[in-house]
Design a protein with these regions (language model features):
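Short, low-complexity Ser/Thr-rich regulatory SLiMs
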Residues: 51, 62-64, 118-122
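A short, polar/charged loop-to-alpha-helix boundary motif
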Residues: 77-85, 137-146
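Active-site nucleotide/adenylate-binding loops and adjacent lid/helix of ATP-dependent enzymes
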Residues: 1-51, 55, 96-99, 193
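Peripheral (often C-terminal) accessory segments that flank ATP-dependent C-N-forming ligase machineries
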Residues: 55, 159-193
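A long amphipathic alpha-helix within ATP-dependent nucleotide-binding catalytic cores
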Residues: 41-44, 80-126, 149-164, 184
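A short beta-strand motif that forms the metal-chelation/ATP-contact edge
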Residues: 60-62, 125-139
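Protein kinase-like catalytic core scaffold
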Residues: 9, 46, 68-69, 114, ...
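Short beta->alpha transition motifs characteristic of CBS
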Residues: 66, 72-75, 131-136
Length: 193
């Protein structure tokens, strides 16, 4: 806990998603009880510094060296800003500095396609809080921007037939997401929103 700046701190179960398994540790007693229980359950937990952000964060979809679309998420019930936890979202434009932060965060873990979550503290400093190789599709419905069109264009312009890469494959992530309504249509017929 001291390594992340003390309490309050955020705990995240490593196998959680959409805000499930994210909790705040506010007191030494609460932290000790929660972490001891999770340890006994063999649960893997990541601790992060708690950053006052007004229960808002930003999800940016990175495709190659660009941010395809970004959405601000605002929490309604607690500190979590996840849409699936009752939050709301709206399309936003990022500053050049925040675009660079998001692209570099994806590159740091060798991803050409990622959802990068950032938030700003009360002074406006940007923090990367998560990089996700399978970012989901709610952002398409909320922003009206289908980032899969950008992703396919990126793949078409950057992959040579027969070329091999040392990067981990994201094909399984893309196929799961694409398995919804667009799978049987050519990519150029997907909704462009």
């Amino acid at each position: 806990i001291n390594k992340v700046g003390g309490l309050p701190a955020i705990g995240k179960l490593l196998n959680g998603s959409q805000g499930v398994g994210v909790f705040i540790l506010e007191t030494p007693q609460a932290a000790n009880t929660a972490l001891e229980s999770l340890y006994r359950l063999n649960a893997n937990v990541k601790l992060q510094k708690f950053i006052k952000s007004g229960a808002k964060d930003i999800r940016a979809i990175v495709v190659g060296d660009k941010v395809s679309v970004a959405m601000e998420r605002a929490g309604k019930k607690d500190f979590r800003a996840n849409i699936s936890q009752g939050g709301s979202g709206r399309k936003v434009e990022l500053s050049d500095a925040d675009i660079e932060i998001c692209v570099n965060a994806a590159k740091a873990i060798n991803l050409d396609f990622a959802g990068v979550d950032i938030l700003k503290d009360e002074e406006g400093k940007t923090y990367v809080i998560e990089v996700n190789g399978n970012p989901g599709t709610k952002i398409i419905d909320i922003t009206g921007h289908n980032y899969f069109v950008d992703l396919v264009k990126y793949v078409e312009s950057n992959v040579t037939k027969g070329e091999k890469s040392d990067k981990p494959s994201q094909a399984s992530s893309a196929s799961v997401i694409l398995g919804k309504s667009w799978l049987n249509a050519p990519w150029n017929q997907w909704p462009k929103h």
